Amino acid sequence: MALPVVAIIGRPNVGKSTLVNRLCRSRDAIVHDEPGVTRDRTYQEGFWGGRTFRVVDTGGLVFDDDSEFLPEIREQASLAMAEACVALVIVDGQQGLTAADEAIAAWLRQQKCPVLLGVNKCESPEQGLAMAAEFWALGLGEPKPISAIHGAGTGDLLDQVLDFLPPQDEEEAPEPIQMAIVGRPNVGKSSLLNTVCGENRAIVSPIRGTTRDTIDTSIEREGQSWKLLDTAGIRRRRSVNYGPEFFGINRSFKAIERSDVCVLVIDAEEGVTEQDQRLAGRIEEEGRACLVVVNKWDLVEKDSHTMPAMEKELRSKLYFLEWAPMLFISALTGQRVERIFPLAVLAVEQHRRRVTTAVVNEVLQEALSWRSPPTTRGGRQGRLYYGTQVAVRPPSFTLFVNEPKLFGDTYRRYVERQIRQGLGFEGSPVRLFWRGKQQRDAERDQARAASR
């Protein structure tokens, strides 16, 4: 059973994102003293009174202006209201009742979702009730004075939220696979998210930097739960000013860190850029499973040779991710989009896979039979005694040798290729740790390992 949803609604700069961070005990929602920082619907999990629910933060509602993203923000707010059990409408107690608040109240009365009214920025308990009193005029029920920044009154508000949540399902839901959708600005990440979800979950625009938050979306595919993380486009550092986009990019890197698998989106028309390479390196550095999705394939003139030729060219530049599957799609038409999920499942399975020591050493012995370790000019030869898997996520192996410095980069890459050829791990990075050991100790430890 999906978690119930609580929507946060209000005009710009009343403290909605600060309240989200307070309710969810996080800093995932971007807070910045500038209207319009939040644009898409962003989701986080909240917990109160033994209940877990999803809090959806929405952009600031403005009804007398249709410039930039404001119509799309209103659409996102409507979608949030449609899926919510209850909406928390936030107003600014210090600024007082405004015409914008009255316009939002009129819009809310057309919605079917029940409403609770929170009067934010009431840091003084003595003045809070007086500040909240004028908001009775909105006709949205009792205005509750709160302070999102200090937490005052938020507990009482959450107690009321619990009354609107459906009965709790006692059966525990399995952990979803977390998939981060990452890439440069304007490669089609939000279009891909919308195609996958079958709705406008994210605002799509040709303007770079439209997505600023990391947008969490929960869906199910063939019995598997997924949490999709659509991230802000990552540009060159000197192109980014301090502000909402700066914070959004930091959220993107955090999304990579907390993901199980990354979908790196490449623009088929533009090919691989320096920023794509840096992003690929970041994914590999974090040790995340990955697949490369080449979007806008519908815009490329092609014949039967175009795809293999382009894949070869792209892989030559994305050498960090030579192990990642590559898929050519069109987020606009939906071409091959559904293939992303089985490839992602396979990558996650390989990322979590463990292999017995006996099987690891069969592969290593075959590698040694095909190509002996290098010998120095002085006649010293590297000796690889045995190996064992020491970790998963990503799969990591310790190889015991006489002297690690005798094994150069070329031979180390050869051993990794042989491990992949013999054991698989498609879609997952592999870590090899070369550790020096005396021959006698290595033989004793190998015998013990073989018995396990």
UniProtKB/Swiss-Prot annotation:
Belongs to the TRAFAC class TrmE-Era-EngA-EngB-Septin-like GTPase superfamily. EngA (Der) GTPase family. Keywords: GTP-binding, Nucleotide-binding, Repeat, Ribosome biogenesis. GTPase that plays an essential role in the late steps of ribosome biogenesis. The keyword Nucleus does not apply. It comes from Synechococcus sp. (strain RCC307). CDD domains: EngA1 (cd01894), EngA2 (cd01895). One of its GO terms (molecular function) is ribosome binding. Pfam families: KH_dom-like, MMR_HSR1. Transmembrane segments: none annotated. GTP 2 binds at residues 183-190, 230-234, 295-298. Residues 4-169, 177-352 form the EngA-type G domain. This is GTPase Der.
